[in-house]
From Swiss-Prot:
Tagged with keyword Lipid metabolism: no
Gene Ontology biological process: DNA-templated transcription
Top EC category: transferase
GO CC terms in record: cytoplasm; DNA-directed RNA polymerase complex
Enzyme Commission number(s) from the entry: 2.7.7.6
Molecular function GO terms recorded: DNA binding; DNA-directed RNA polymerase activity; protein dimerization activity
Species of provenance: Cereibacter sphaeroides (strain ATCC 17025 / ATH 2.4.3) (Rhodobacter sphaeroides)
HAMAP family assigned to the protein according to its UniProt record, in alphabetical order: RNApol_bact_RpoA
Region (Alpha C-terminal domain (alpha-CTD)) location: 250-338
NCBIfam families the record matches: PRK05182.1-2 (NF003513), PRK05182.2-5 (NF003519), rpoA (TIGR02027)
Family stated for the protein in its record: Belongs to the RNA polymerase alpha chain family.
Subunit organization: Homodimer. The RNAP catalytic core consists of 2 alpha, 1 beta, 1 beta' and 1 omega subunit. When a sigma factor is associated with the core the holoenzyme is formed, which can initiate transcription.
Protein name per the record: DNA-directed RNA polymerase subunit alpha
Chain's gene name: rpoA
Cited function: DNA-dependent RNA polymerase catalyzes the transcription of DNA into RNA using the four ribonucleoside triphosphates as substrates.
Length: 338
């Protein structure tokens, strides 16, 4: 029954996040178990979105006093303007306000000019304050005006030059993505007695403006939103009923005991050992939960899915207010309907 297919696919029960040396910037994110092939599918999709589609902030242009173009040099500054521009690309910024905004650097030598010398304003934070921009000799001074903006992905310098750009404004390639590195690995894993599932391990490094865990969450949300247009049907009804005359808010079949089903001895014993008494108990279990049951394998799972399908039911269903307080009395009352 294809309309129930997605509910029957195995899904990870939880996301494991292992922080790196700097938890705000580096972490390993693990999801398991996944259906075979889903590790590669999800890993590749998440990696591409992480690197290309998350919003961040970057310096988009600079104006330096007494400098007309990027091939100039500044008296008393060891780096030429080209090197200064390259160093400005490496400044990591967190921006919680709409851009563009103007910041500045004013420094006198001798000394090192770092990202920490950039003037901050409300809603803008410099994340790597120790990042070196240039070195000043004795008696040298420098003043720069920076334009910062928000965006996503990579934007070339020529796109950052406004039409009314003043003389001396130098546009800069903007790397907006807060995610610096992403790699993933897919390895086999087991769930219960089944060995052919995928384990997805992602290693994510950010600039500190976003934690790796949050970055993965936002990437997943983007994918979810983009895929929603392809879903052209309504969700099937749950096992809960709302317009009934017998006063029962769920399918009476849920009151049937699982030992009355025509199951193999092995499957029946597994359900009994897991304290699954009624069909209502059974259908709320997911495939992943069932496969964790000792001695319960794929053969038993397929058997149960087939039996439930014949009753118009499936694993992973939602039943409100289950179990009812008077479940034994209700089971006797409706046993003639089984």
């Amino acid at each position: 029954m294809i309309h129930k297919n997605w509910a029957e696919l195995i899904k990870p029960t939880q996301l494991v996040v292992k922080p790196g040396a700097d938890p705000a910037r580096v972490a390993t994110v693990i999801a398991e178990p996944l259906e075979r092939g889903f590790g590669l599918t999800l890993g590749n999709a998440l990696r591409r979105v992480l690197l290309s589609s998350l919003q961040g902030a970057a310096i988009t242009s600079v104006q330096i006093d007494n400098v007309l173009h990027e091939f100039s040099s500044v008296a008393g500054v060891r780096e030429d303007v080209t090197d200064i521009v390259l160093n400005l690309k490496g400044v990591s910024i967190k921006m919680d306000v709409e851009g563009p905004k103007r910041l500045s650097i004013s420094a006198k030598g001798p000394g090192v000019v770092t990202a920490g010398d950039i003037s901050e304003s409300n809603g803008i934070e410099i994340l790597n304050k120790d990042h070196v921009i240039c070195h000043l000799d004795e008696g040298a001074d420098v003043f720069m005006e920076l334009t910062v903006n928000t965006g996503k992905g990579y934007v070339a310098a020529d796109k950052n030059r406004p039409e009314d750009a003043p003389i001396g404004l130098i546009p800069i390639d903007a790397i907006y993505s807060p995610v610096k590195k992403v790699s993933y690995e897919v390895t086999p894993t087991r769930e219960g007695q089944v060995l052919d599932y995928d384990k997805l391990t992602m290693r994510v490094e950010t600039d500190g403006g976003l934690t790796p865990e949050d970055a993965v969450a936002y990437a997943a949300r983007i994918l979810q939103d983009q895929l929603s247009i392809f879903v052209n049907f309504e969700e099937p009804e749950s096992a809960t009923r709302h317009d009934v005359e017998d006063g029962l808010e769920f399918n009476p079949l849920l009151l049937k005991k699982v030992d009355e089903l025509e199951l193999s001895v092995r499957s029946a014993n597994c359900l009994k050992n897991d304290n699954i008494v009624y069909i209502g108990d059974l259908i709320q279990k997911t495939e992943a939960e069932m496969l964790r049951t000792p001695n319960f394998g794929r053969k038993s799972l397929n058997e149960i899915k087939e039996v439930l399908s014949g009753m118009g039911l499936h694993l992973g269903m939602d039943v409100e207010d289950w179990p009812p307080e008077n479940i034994e009395d209700l089971a006797k009352r409706f046993e003639d309907q089984f």
